[in-house]
């Protein structure tokens, strides 16, 4: 896929999506395969809490079509270290677990900092200097997600440019909305979907996102993720944005076979994505209220 804009959601396993996104009867083991044929990227939140073996990353890679990409959230401990030595140890541990098994499907790495981390030039200079530009000969793209308003500072953007990194644009009223045009890629996390909107957002909002992404894509590769908010609506939001942008993901023609856990027929009929339910599913234990 050569389109400069990729659109996705956070993860692929979320119980309410069984009603609003996945076809009836689709096995859990086939959810990534299905999602990757309806969307063009996904943000992996599980790497924020746990480490995985190279075989797991390779399995994810093999389950998805050409052009699909994974954005990984770096482990939460890697952005709370205070000394150069501890930073390097945590960063190396995360990058060394086997993420390069994703190969060309490895997208931006999101280094998410806590809201308490204020902008201090020396601190961020030290952190950014520990981020390698490649791993196992695979280029790495680093995006810092900051949640303290003091980071909305030109000096912060200068540091990012110096180290070929960018800042995550987080659309949420609780966090600063910082835009950086100095990198060759951009990452946006849209976090305000509403349960009373079948597509999570109004048509006007989807149109606005499309205009912004199109403008950014004139000079950058763009990754847009619908995260948190009314999470049950996020796949519908992502597909609505893709439709507005004219993005056509890999076909899900084999979805019928996936739904039954069987091999697809030689020439299966293409299935349409299930329509977003207008009924809000009950919140489950897998539907966290905390913003990620």
Each model region followed by its residue ranges:
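Residues lining hydrophobic/aromatic ligand-binding pockets adjacent to catalytic sites
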Residues: 1-292
